[in-house]
Amino acid sequence: MPSTLIHVSLALLLAAGLLGTEFDGRSVLVVAAATAVPDLDVALEPVLSGAHRSVGHNFVLPGLVLLALAADLRRGPDSLLHRRYGDRGVTLAFTAVVCLVGAGIVPDLVVGGINAFYPLHDAFYTVDGRLFYSTDRGWVQTFVDLSPDDPEPQRTTSNFDFRTVLDAEPTLGVEDSGGGSGEAGGGGGSQRVERLFPVAMTGFRAWLLPLAAFVTGTRLWRARRSANAGVDGGDRA
């Protein structure tokens, strides 16, 4: 699983791209702290089985934070956040939430899985697969399987838990599963070469695509808005 350092590193890249010239030492501390919050659930593992990747690694937590921010900002001039930190504080708060989700939670969703809707719904989910173009098969994706084989039992906190640094032998996770069968060898007929053009061969790499698009689009939008504001200011002068 990605380490906390990896999560924070990705978050700082996100924040640097989103905040631009507003990215400073305070931003680093706020973003790093927000991104590290999910991994604190490892401390609850000894007293709450399945806490890791559940208590902190879910979409309910950032949802509640967004609701709290929205409720505060609806107060207008009486907004505690805006009154104390101004527009910059509001921007930093929402950036921290984006980093919490984009760098703190989703990377674990695509590497091993998380209890995405805990405690509202106790079930671990993993988004993983491959996307590529094949000269034989055309576009191939395995992220969404519309005709799955016999489903495996749903992972929950009662039958699955991730090994952590608190365990003697940390692993990616443990669960009861049957032995997998190897793929059969090739058949007869003429040989031909299949050429693959990789796009995203793992869930983590697939997540980087929309993430990069989001950061790039946001930075371009903010740059355009700043440029337009400068032009309008010059016209008034």
Model regions and ranges:
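N-terminal membrane-targeting hydrophobic helices
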Residues: M1-A237
